[in-house]
């Protein structure tokens, strides 16, 4: 067959408009300047709510896609500025208020702290003894471990980084202003996906990974090799001088001297010649493939992670040369999508290119779904393959990082549902999507949703039924009739099979590796300083049961979000939903039973199920790790676990979860008064209050409050102190938004205080 050369694309040019929008502080100083109605100023208290709701809804400011794109682009720089300021604050605390040097000297006994409370009226009780003579609040962000892995050896270096982050923040703020007011990209620049993919893949991910690999190789590895030797009690000698403490370690730039660094890694003597002559094995002492964990630190081998980032860099730099721009070579995304047809999928992906280059909601939705999923995968990798030194034995940090990444993932995935529904309402054009995949999914949405609903009902009744059965049998004193590892077994055979494959496979796939990918699949206990860093996680009946609760709650969350997206424009009940918009409380007066059908309401309801779902995930993790993994290694080699292995028997019943997990482990937060964790006791109480406060918004109607307000306004009129701005009750949607925000805030802070008071006390 002959292959005709691909059509040359139109030449790509980075085109900008000069000075498109004047810089006017006078205009910005006027609240609501972006909306004609809001700019008139407040008539009623609803104004302030609408101001917040619409400030960042760029679609409502203008219908010009180019201007919307520029606003989003500019806002990204603003977001980056905020992130740099936040990071600067974290590094500044590490530099100014922390025991980083003390922790570095003795990471197995000293706990990380980067905040010291000032004594005003007794709060200094919060400054607990974290070891090494330092008193402060124990932090659980994992920053100390990250800093050690990066090669920081003193607080001054953290200071410099904090200042550098502020400089970067200033640069980002300037860039955000410059690319909106001085040189704003044209729409075609935002829509040029091939160039965008090439630059993001090769530049951001490829060169980003390469520069990090370079930092790891030239700074992190020598510093960490010296620190590990000190911690192992066998300090190394450099240029005839024993490196006995972190203070003796040469500064990063000194390792540019090949004669110095090659005393630690002889491979550096090979120089770049070995690279160009393909004699890559010369670098095998600092680019390794060991597998498993470093026995001194309980973290991944940093020589493995340097190798990993170098490999990732190569992959992404190659990937960044795949898409066709000015050189008539490579892929065209439009061609790929339009060629993507199956035997049963009609026009396939035709039309999706146009959607993803004109609807940023559609684009954002996909990105949120992927990023949310990645965040949840990261949560699991944090304990399966702990990446930083001494992270795995810092149990409060392990629990915090897992919980954090799980919740972030949940919020992002709900956000994916939200923006998919907004896309359907605001940007979807049925005439341009005839018989493509999106159209076909929408046409058989009833089949999809009814089947998904059936799955949810099946999972819910069966998984819950197993627990109810066990509670009943235990209450009747018939343990032999329970589902358990010692009676009627429900072993997770597929999960055990996967664990076994992963434990055995590296023997064949990586014969030179020292250990398998992760100890959680099977292998030996890795202990650091007498504490378990990693151990095989044995799964049994209790895990099988709670796993099916996970399956149930995740499927219900997916059902709510997917129903919201697929029925965002129309349904049998409300055929003209597309005209009502993304958020509306009900289909007007005179149509009862049409409330909570808008796209927004599905996001609202999905948030509750997301929270419900992920609470059980983090409870499962917290209890399982305390019961079966975390603990102290006794002199005879056995492990005394924090919760003494009670998960397998107690987690079989609902009563067990309530009594042996929630109630038993809440004793630390409930009895924290008068101790350095007493703040968690107050947060625990306060967060319960915030959570209960949310119910006032969720369980009452707007009319009740409007009636009350009018009576209060009457009293003010009597006293001639009536306000100029007329008070109004929250709209139905606003009430629900305030309700769900407090519900989630209260729930998350309750869990946070419960987890940390417990694990700081026992971990």
Curated annotation (Swiss-Prot):
Name of the top EC class for this enzyme: oxidoreductase
Annotated positions binding chlorophyll a': 688
Transmembrane segments: 72-95, 158-181, 197-221, 305-323, 360-383, 399-425, 447-469, 544-562, 602-623, 677-699, 737-757
SUPFAM superfamilies reported for this sequence: Photosystem I subunits PsaA/PsaB (SSF81558)
Single GO MF annotation: magnesium ion binding
Residue positions binding phylloquinone: 705
Catalytic activity: reduced [plastocyanin] + hnu + oxidized [2Fe-2S]-[ferredoxin] = oxidized [plastocyanin] + reduced [2Fe-2S]-[ferredoxin]
Subunit structure: The PsaA/B heterodimer binds the P700 chlorophyll special pair and subsequent electron acceptors. PSI consists of a core antenna complex that captures photons, and an electron transfer chain that converts photonic excitation into a charge separation. The cyanobacterial PSI reaction center is composed of one copy each of PsaA,B,C,D,E,F,I,J,K,L,M and X, and forms trimeric complexes.
Protein name stated in the entry: Photosystem I P700 chlorophyll a apoprotein A1
């Amino acid at each position: 067959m002959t292959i005709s050369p691909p059509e040359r694309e139109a030449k790509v040019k980075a085109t900008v408009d000069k000075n498109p929008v004047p810089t006017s502080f006078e205009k910005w100083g006027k609240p609501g300047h972006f909306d004609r109605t809001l700019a008139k100023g407040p008539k009623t208290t609803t104004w302030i709510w609408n101001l917040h709701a619409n400030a960042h809804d760029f679609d409502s400011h203008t219908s010009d896609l180019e201007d919307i794109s520029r606003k989003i682009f500019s806002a990204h720089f603003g977001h980056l500025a905020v992130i740099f300021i936040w990071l600067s604050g974290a590094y500044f605390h590490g530099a100014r208020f922390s025991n980083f040097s003390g922790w570095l000297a003795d990471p197995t006994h000293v706990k990380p702290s980067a905040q010291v409370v000032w004594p005003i009226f007794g709060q200094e009780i919060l400054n607990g003894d974290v070891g090494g003579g330092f008193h402060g609040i124990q932090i659980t962000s994992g920053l100390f471990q990250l800093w050690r892995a990066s090669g920081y050896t003193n607080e001054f270096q953290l200071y410099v980084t904090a200042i550098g982050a502020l400089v970067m923040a200033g640069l980002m703020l300037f860039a955000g202003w410059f690319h909106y007011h001085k040189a704003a990209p044209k729409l075609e620049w935002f829509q040029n996906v091939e160039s965008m993919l090439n630059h993001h893949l090769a530049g951001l991910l490829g060169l980003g990974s390469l520069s990090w690999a370079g930092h790891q190789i030239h700074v992190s590895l020598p510093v960490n090799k010296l620190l590990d030797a000190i911690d192992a009690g066998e300090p190394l000698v450099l240029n005839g001088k024993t490196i006995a403490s972190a203070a003796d370690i040469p500064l990063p730039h000194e390792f540019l001297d090949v004669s110095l660094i090659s005393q630690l890694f002889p491979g550096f003597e090979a120089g770049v010649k070995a690279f160009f002559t393909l004699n890559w094995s010369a670098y095998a002492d600092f680019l390794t493939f060991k597998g498993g964990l470093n026995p001194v630190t309980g973290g991944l081998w940093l020589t493995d992670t340097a190798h990993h980032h170098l490999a990732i860099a190569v992959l992404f730099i190659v990937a960044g040369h795949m898409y066709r721009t000015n050189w008539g070579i490579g892929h065209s995304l439009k061609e790929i999508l339009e060629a993507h047809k199956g035997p049963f999928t009609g026009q396939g992906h035709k039309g999706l290119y146009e959607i993803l280059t004109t609807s940023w909601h559609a684009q954002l939705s996909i990105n949120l779904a992927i990023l949310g999923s990645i965040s949840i995968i990261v949560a699991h990798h944090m304990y399966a393959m702990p990446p930083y030194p001494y992270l795995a034995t810092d149990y409060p940090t392990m629990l915090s990082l897992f919980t954090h990444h799980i919740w972030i993932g949940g919020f992002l995935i709900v956000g994916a549902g939200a923006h998919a529904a907004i896309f359907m309402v605001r940007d979807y054009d049925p005439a341009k999507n005839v018989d493509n995949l999106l159209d076909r999914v929408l046409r058989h949405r009833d089949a999809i949703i009814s089947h998904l609903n059936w799955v949810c009902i099946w999972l819910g009744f069966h998984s819950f039924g197993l627990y109810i059965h066990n509670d009943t049998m235990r209450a009747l004193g018939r343990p032999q009739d329970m589902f358990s590892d010692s009676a009627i077994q429900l072993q997770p055979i597929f999960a055990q099979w996967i664990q076994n494959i992963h434990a055995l496979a590296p023997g064949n796939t990586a014969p030179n590796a020292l250990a398998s990918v992760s100890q959680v699949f099977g292998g030996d206990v890795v202990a650091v300083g007498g504490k378990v860093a990693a151990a095989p996680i044995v799964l049994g009946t209790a895990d099988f049961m709670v796993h099916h609760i996970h399956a149930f709650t995740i499927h219900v969350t997916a059902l709510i979000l997917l129903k919201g997206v697929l029925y965002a424009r129309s349904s049998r009940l409300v055929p003209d939903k597309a005209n009502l918009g993304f958020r509306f409380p009900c289909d007007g007066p005179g149509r009862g039973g049409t409330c909570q059908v808008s796209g927004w309401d599905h996001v609202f309801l999905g948030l509750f199920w997301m929270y419900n779902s992920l609470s059980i995930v983090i409870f499962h993790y917290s209890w399982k790790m305390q019961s079966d993994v975390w603990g102290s290694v006794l002199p005879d080699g056995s492990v005394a676990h924090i919760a003494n292995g009670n998960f397998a028997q107690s987690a079989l019943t609902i009563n067990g979860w309530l009594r042996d997990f929630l109630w038993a482990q809440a004793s630390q937060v409930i009895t924290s008064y008068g101790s350095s964790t007493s703040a968690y006791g107050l947060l625990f109480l306060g967060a319960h209050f915030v959570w209960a406060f949310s119910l006032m918004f969720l369980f009452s109607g707007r009319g009740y409050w409007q009636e009350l307000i009018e009576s209060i306004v009457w009293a003010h009129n009597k006293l001639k102190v009536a306000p100029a701005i007329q008070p109004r009750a929250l709209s139905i949607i606003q009430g629900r938004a305030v309700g769900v925000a407090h519900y989630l805030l209260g729930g998350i802070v309750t869990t946070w205080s419960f987890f940390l008071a417990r694990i700081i006390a026992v971990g």
